[in-house]
Amino acid sequence: MNIGLGAARKTILLVDADPHARATLRKALEASGFSVGEAATGEEGERTAHRIHPDAILTDLMMETIDAGGEIARRLAETGRQIPVYMVSTAADGLVGATGFAELGISGVFLKPVDPAIVIRTLKTRLGAG
């Protein structure tokens, strides 16, 4: 289920304080042909995004600060970079059914527990990597 031999590998940045959550998604993404970068905090995620120039970012909403994931999306949008940012959240985070994602620079939300197949399908569709 690789992205394709002739296509450039798309890079995904995973930002989550939970190393198990990152490892689970990383393994699934790499098995599907994506290159993966990781960060454990919002601040580290922002630095890593500037360093590796990912094609998309998956970030937990709630990390070391109240809204670390939303802050990453907002700051990247302020720089003018057009990187799809997807939140990984629980229904308790209050994002389900919320509106205004586009204004925050958020491309979508994946609910925990995350189904890697849905994430991969969404990323391949969005990034033209299918």
Predicted regions and their residues:
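Active-site residues of response regulator receiver
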Residues: 60-61
